[in-house]
Amino acid sequence: MTRYTPAEIEARWQKAWRENEVFKAIRSADKPKYYVLEMFPYPSGRIHMGHVRNYTMGDVIARYKLATGHNVLHPMGWDAFGMPAENAAMAIGGHPKDWTYGNIKDMRDQMKPLGLSIDWSREFATCDPEYYGQQQALFLDFLEAGLVYRKNAIVNWDPVDMTVLANEQVEQGRGWRSGALVERRELTQWFFKISDHSEELLSALDTLENWPAKVRLMQENWIGKSRGLQFAFSTIDGPDGHDRIEVYTTRPDTLLGASFVGISPDHPLAKLLERDNDNVAAFCAECRKGGTTEEAIETAEKLGFDTGLRVRHPFDTAAELPVYIANFILMDYGTGAIFGCPAHDQRDFEFATKYDLPIISTFLPSQDADEVLSEAFVPAKTEKVFYNRGFAGAEFQTGLEAIDAAIDFCESNGIGQGVTKYRLRDWGLSRQRYWGCPIPVVHCDDCGVVPEKKENLPIELPYDVSFDTPGNPLNRHPTWRDTPCPACGKPAQRETDTMDTFVDSSWYFARFTAPRAETPTVMEDAQYWMNVDQYIGGIEHAILHLLYSRFFARAMQMTGHLPQSAIEPFDALFTQGMVTHEIYQTRDANGRPVYHLPEDVTDGRLADGTEVEIIPSAKMSKSKKNVVDPLGIIASYGADTARWFVLSDSPPERDVEWTASGAEAAFKHLTRVWTLSERIGKMDKDAAGQGDEDLLRAMHVCIHDVTMGIESFGFNAAIAKLYAFTAKLQKSKAGYGAQRTAIMTLAQLMSPMTPHLAEDIWAHQGGDGLVTTAPWPRADEAMLVSDTVTLPVQINGKRRAEIVISADLSKEEVEKIALADPAVIRSLNGATPKKIIVVPGRIVNVVV
C-alpha cells in the first residue's frame, strides 16, 4: 500500500465480486430471504446524482442484510417504453428501439462503476418481448377474469403527442411530456377495473405500517371515500326521457341554499340539447377543449350556459332552479350533475356572482352573524356552526352531524338515499403510441373483440415503422395491423393502441422473482421472494405507481400469478429526498436569467468579473446548468467518495445539496482511513499499548450505533458515528491487537457505504475472504455500559466545567465532586449555591 487510488482499488474489487458471483440470488431454505428494490430507472442515457443517491441507499441495505445472514435479492431493470423514445426518433431520425437499447447499455456501463450489489443476471427491460409478452398474458388473464373492459370515455387528449393521458399525466392543464394544452375527447378505451377494489385498497392502507404516513394519506385522499346523498330534481316540461336530473352530493345539509343546477357538457341532457341548438353545441364544443383533470377544471374560468330548463326543489315544489351547462362539471364524477350552493362553495360563489344568481346561506359562524357574503363560507366539517336554514338536526351542530341528519331526513321522507362513493376512477390504459406494449386483442367484423391466443404471444412490435407524421405508426402498418381473427380465421385487425407505461412498472417487482420464466411468474419463486421487503423511490410516485402496483398485485393473485400473501407487494417503503445544487445566474438586458456552469464561477464571479447571483439548494436541471455529472466525480474521487457524500450530508428523506467542498472533504476522510489502515499494518505486532479496553469499548459502541443507524435509515447518523470512531482510533495508543481489531471492524461497518475501500483494508489486514460476505460484527452488550460518565456542570445556565465520575455515585456524592471542581470554584467566586440539581447521567445545574 502506498496511497489511496480509487480507480485501481474499485476495479479490482468489482472484478472479485463478479468472479465470485457474490450477489447472485438463488433460493435457499437455509437463510431468511430479503428483497430490496429501488424503483427502476427510465433509460434516458445518463445517470445523475439522484440515481447515485437512490441506488446507494438500496445498496447499503442490501449489503447490510447480506452481512447479517440474509439471502438477498437486489435486482435491476429498465422502465423502457414511453414517448421520449418516439420523440427522439422523430428528432434525430433513428428508431425508438435502437435509441432505448443504446441508452440502456450506456447507463448500465455508468452504473456498474458505483459498485452496486446488483444481481445483473436478472436484468430486463420492459421493452424486451420476453417481458411484454408475459404482460400480454397477464392482460388476457385479467380480461377473462373481468378485470379489464372497454367503453367510450371522455379522455385527456394531447394534440401534439396525439395520445390519451391519464389525469395524473396532465400538469396545469398541459401534457406532462409535450407541454401542449390538453383537450377533452370521447374515445373507445380499455380500462382496468381498479375502482372495484376501492374499499380494499383504502382499508388495507392501515396495514402498511412501514410506509410513510404522508404517502398513505395521499393514497387515501386519491381513493376519496365519501358518504353523501343521491337524489333527483324533477324537471319542469323537460324533454322526453329527462323528467329527472340525478345528483350526488356530499353536502346535503346545504340543500336549502341551492340556487341552480349544473350539468356536464357531456351529460345526456346536454347532448340532447346540443343536437337542436347551435349555441348549445358551440358552448359544449368549447368546454371540451379543456382537460378533464381537477386541476384543469379548477384553474379554468367558470363558464355556464342557461339551458332555459327549470327544475323543482325537492323540499319546495314551488321553488324553481335554473339548469346550466357548466364547464367545471365532469361526467365521470358523481352523476355528471350538481346543485350549486354559492354561499358554501367558492366555485359556485364565483359562478353565481358571474351569472347574477341568488346566494343563500344555510349556516353561519354564529347566530348573530351577517348573511351578506363577500366570499363563500366554507368551514371544516368538524366545526360547529349555526344552521339558519337547517332542516334536520340541531341548530348548532358540526357539518358532519348535519350531513348525517340530512341523509336520515331525506331517506325518511323519500327524497333520496344515502350512498358511499369513491373518487378513484377506473384506470384507462389505452395509449395511441407505438413504443409501448401492444394490447393483445383483435377486432373482427363477425366476432367482435377477440382475445389473441396465448400461443401467439408475444405480439411483437414491428420494426419497420415511420415517425414522419404525428399519430400512431401502428395504424399505418397494414402488414402488422391486418391479421386473421383468432376465433373464425377471417380477415381482422389488431388493436393498435398500446398500454400505458404505468402497466409495465406495476408488476416488474414480481417478474424479478423469475425473470426468464415462460409464464409471468413462477409460484414457488414468488412465494419465496415476495414481498419486496424494502422499496425505495421518490415521493412523486406516491399515487400512480404505488397504487397501480397494489391493484396489480391483487389482480395477479386473483388470476393465479401471486400468492395471497403478496397482495400488498411492498412491506416497507422509503421515499428519499433529491440531490440539489446551487444555480449560478446573471441577468440579460431584459432581466431574464442567464445560467452559468459551476466551473465558470470563482468566488461568486465570472472570469470577466461579473458578479453572479447564487440560488441555493435547487433541483438539478440541465437547462439551469447545475447538473453534477456522477461520472466526473467518480473519475476524480472514486465511487466510494460519491457514495459516502450522498449518504453523509443529510438525512436520507431530505434533500442533500451537492458541493465540491463536500465531495473533497469526503475524499480526504476516506484517504485518512486508508492511511490509518496502512499505519496500523506497520505496527510492531508484539508491542504493548495503552487504552486497549477504552478503544474496544468505543468500537462496540460504534457497532451498536451504526447498526441502529442503518436499520432505521439513519445513514447520516451512522456515518457521524464512523467519523467519531475513526478520530478516536487515529489518536489511540492501544496495542497492535486492539488497533487491528478496531480497523477491521471499521472496515466492516463502512462496507455497506464504501465497499471498495472496506475490501482493500480487510484484505490488507489479513481478513478471511471478502468483507462483503463476512458476518456483521455484533456489539458486546457488556461493553456498552461504561464504568464512568462525563457530566457537564452549568452555573446559572452557563456551562462552566465537565466532571468525570463513577456511574454509580449518589446525587449527594455528585454534588460534592462538582462543587470541588477547580473551574466551578473559580466561577462561583465565593458565592453560595441556592440550589443544586443533579440529572443522573446527564447534567449538574448549579443555581446561585
UniProtKB/Swiss-Prot annotation:
GO terms for cellular component: cytosol. A motif ('KMSKS' region) lies at residues 619-623. It comes from Roseobacter denitrificans (strain ATCC 33942 / OCh 114) (Erythrobacter sp. (strain OCh 114)). Its EC number is 6.1.1.4. GO terms for molecular function: aminoacyl-tRNA deacylase activity; ATP binding; leucine-tRNA ligase activity. One of its GO terms (biological process) is leucyl-tRNA aminoacylation. ATP binds at residue 622. Keywords: Aminoacyl-tRNA synthetase, ATP-binding, Cytoplasm, Ligase, Nucleotide-binding, Protein biosynthesis. It catalyses: tRNA(Leu) + L-leucine + ATP = L-leucyl-tRNA(Leu) + AMP + diphosphate. Its main location: cytoplasm. Pfam families: Anticodon_1 (PF08264), tRNA-synt_1 (PF00133), tRNA-synt_1_2 (PF13603), tRNA-synt_1g (PF09334). Belongs to the class-I aminoacyl-tRNA synthetase family. The gene is leuS. This is Leucine--tRNA ligase. PANTHER family: LEUCINE--TRNA LIGASE, MITOCHONDRIAL, LEUCYL-TRNA SYNTHETASE. A motif ('HIGH' region) lies at residues 41-51. It is found in: Cytoplasm. Gene3D superfamilies: 2.20.28.290, 3.10.20.590, HUPs (3.40.50.620), Isoleucyl-tRNA Synthetase, Domain 1 (1.10.730.10), Valyl/Leucyl/Isoleucyl-tRNA synthetase, editing domain (3.90.740.10). It comes from the Bacteria.
